[in-house]
């Protein structure tokens, strides 16, 4: 049986995680972990760069203070997932996908996917615009 609001795809597939990817979890909530991550995931490189960053935020103002540095760490071809509390799960937050775009678009990022990361978190996948790579 599948959970309402979910595609049935494994979390790692939704997030685009592959063996060998360098992954960083920013502002990870206590007790939160990737569900069934692929073998061979690694932490960020010595300079903090990563193929995929999953950053959790509860308030919009937190995004503005961190998105520039997070974007630098995925340059040129990585992905930044900005996660916020899912309203469909009864959580409250001032973050929406529109709010995230207001921070992301002016610095050269573009959104390419939205997904339910899990029961409690929604996510918007951001990448560098092709002309900025």
Labelled PLM ranges:
Residues 64-95:
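Mid-chain, well-packed structural core segment of small domains
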Residues 40-50:
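Short acidic low-complexity segments
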Residues 54-63:
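Short, glycine-rich nucleotide/cofactor-binding loops
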Residues 108-133:
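Class I S-adenosyl-L-methionine
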Residues 1-38:
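N-terminal, charge-rich interaction modules
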Residues 94-113:
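Conserved Class I S-adenosyl-L-methionine
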Residues 16, 38-40, 68-70, 95-98:
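Short, glycine/charged-enriched secondary-structure capping and boundary segments
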């Amino acid at each position: 049986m599948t959970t309402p609001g979910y595609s049935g795809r494994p979390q790692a597939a939704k997030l685009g995680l592959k063996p060998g990817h360098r992954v960083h979890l920013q502002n990870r909530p206590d007790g939160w972990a990737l569900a069934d991550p692929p073998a061979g995931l690694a932490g960020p490189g010595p300079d903090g760069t990563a193929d995929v960053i999953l950053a959790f935020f509860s308030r919009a103002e937190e995004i503005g203070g961190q998105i520039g540095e997070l974007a630098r760490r995925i340059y040129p071809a990585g992905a930044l997932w900005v996660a916020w509390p899912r309203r469909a799960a009864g959580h409250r937050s001032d973050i929406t996908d529109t709010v995230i775009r207001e921070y992301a678009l002016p610095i050269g990022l573009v959104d390419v996917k939205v997904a339910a990361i899990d029961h409690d978190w929604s996510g918007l996948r951001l990448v560098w615009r092709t002309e900025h790579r």
